[in-house]
Amino acid sequence: MADYGLFIGWGQVTRGREKTALDEFNDGIQYYAGLQEKGDIESFEPVILEQHGGDLLGFVLIRGEREKLARLRIDREFERRTIRAGLVVNSLGVVGALVGQGVSEGLVTYQQQLDELT
């Protein structure tokens, strides 16, 4: 079971690039499905948020093993796609995330460091 994730979030689509952004989104879904099929990631979940007045309009949460996702982040194709997405949406971000058992392990590490410092 996955212990780590990549949170890929984005904001408003760049004006005039709406069609391109939709095409890139659909292509990205196929890309993630291919990564899942190859075993490079465990799963992914695209999410589109309701209008809420904030900057975050959607995200994809990719789940997998920390080492595999670390390799993915420096993969040239992943980098190319991230750069391309950043040209059609605002506020694109890729952030590592603890998920599943990783949350418990992260909290244990946090507690240990807290205990050492207090």
Where are these regions (language model features)?
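Mid-chain, well-packed structural core segment of small domains
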Residues: 58-88
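C-terminal end-helix/capping segment
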Residues: 90-92
